[in-house]
């Protein structure tokens, strides 16, 4: 922002900053405005905290601009699940990438949570995947009940990644997990570019479960969506675990009982 860069920080006003950013709004770059105003406010907050200025005149500057529209992740309709599983069965992609996509679909986890999954997080005896808070978007630990199908996927990949820290280790960088974009790139190669992204697998699961009238609170708990009420959130995590186990098993059965259910068998044979 050259027009502001030469000004002493105590001379920067909201009106002139808005004027500088208006061309971005006119160009439709609303996400960029959001990022820029956040960065500017971090600087101004630092200046207040260090005594350089008394107040931050730009604190509410984002209200002067149109908010960026929320982008929904590309996903499929439930009726398209059989075709997806068939395409996945015969896709020309690596075995670990194929299972990575299936694991995310079965567990309803986020791409980053799946890509970084560690063997130490898996409790085979309790049939649970315990994801620590630092790996979760909302920085809260999340436990996912594992269906028989997900346990079977673990046995499929164990010979290929059992010696690694990660379920899905990178084949390019030793000691690291696969890129969070690996699944997206594979879906594009499968012909789903512009129709489905890895994060959209969660929406596919959510839509299917809601259509079959599962408890919405149980679905939200499975998706690790935030409940602003801390007590209610803690209660739900404990109370819904067994209900989620039943639901996750139903979801896995739905995935593998589609007319094109050769996916796991194909992986085992190849």
Segments from the language model and where they lie:
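Basic/aromatic-enriched alpha-helical hairpins
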Residues: 1-27, 43-46
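Hydrophobic (often cysteine-bearing) scaffold residues that line and stabilize catalytic clefts
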Residues: 13, 32-39, 77, 96-97, ...
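Active-site/catalytic core of tyrosine-dependent DNA strand-transfer enzymes
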Residues: 77-82, 126, 145-194, 200, ...
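C-terminal secondary-structure termini that scaffold catalytic or DNA-interacting sites
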Residues: 137, 148-152, 156-164, 169-175, ...
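C-terminal catalytic core of tyrosine-transesterase DNA break-rejoin enzymes
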Residues: 31, 49, 102, 106-113, ...
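Basic, Lys/Arg- and aromatic-enriched nucleic-acid-binding interface segment
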Residues: 26-39, 49, 53-117, 125, ...
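Short, polar N-cap/turn motifs at the start of nucleic acid-interacting alpha helices
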Residues: 55, 121-128, 193-195, 214-236, ...
């Amino acid at each position: 922002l050259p027009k502001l860069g030469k000004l002493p920080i105590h001379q920067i006003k909201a009106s002139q900053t808005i004027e500088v950013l208006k061309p971005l709004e006119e160009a439709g770059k609303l996400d960029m405005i959001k990022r820029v105003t956040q960065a500017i406010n971090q600087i101004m907050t630092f200046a207040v905290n260090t005594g350089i200025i008394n107040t931050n005149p730009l604190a509410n500057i984002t209200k002067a601009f149109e908010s960026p529209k929320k982008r929904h992740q590309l996903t499929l309709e439930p009726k398209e699940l059989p075709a997806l599983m068939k395409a996945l069965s015969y896709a020309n992609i690596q075995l670990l990438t194929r299972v990575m996509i299936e694991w995310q679909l079965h567990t309803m986890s986020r791409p980053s949570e799946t890509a970084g999954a560690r063997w130490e997080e898996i409790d085979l005896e309790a049939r649970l995947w315990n994801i620590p808070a630092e790996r979760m978007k909302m920085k809260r630990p999340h436990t996912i009940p594992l269906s028989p199908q997900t346990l079977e996927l673990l046995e499929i990949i164990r010979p290929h990644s059992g010696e690694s820290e990660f379920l899905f280790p990178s084949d390019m960088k030793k000691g690291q997990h696969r890129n969070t974009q690996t699944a997206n790139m594979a879906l594009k190669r499968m012909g789903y570019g512009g129709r489905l992204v890895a994060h959209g697998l969660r929406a596919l699961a959510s839509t299917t479960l809601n259509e079959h009238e599962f408890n919405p609170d149980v679905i939200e708990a499975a998706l690790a969506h935030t409940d602003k009420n801390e007590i209610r959130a803690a209660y739900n995590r404990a109370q819904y675990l067994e209900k989620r186990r039943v639901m996750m098993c139903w979801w896995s059965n739905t995935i593998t009982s589609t007319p094109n259910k050769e996916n796991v068998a194909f992986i085992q044979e190849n």
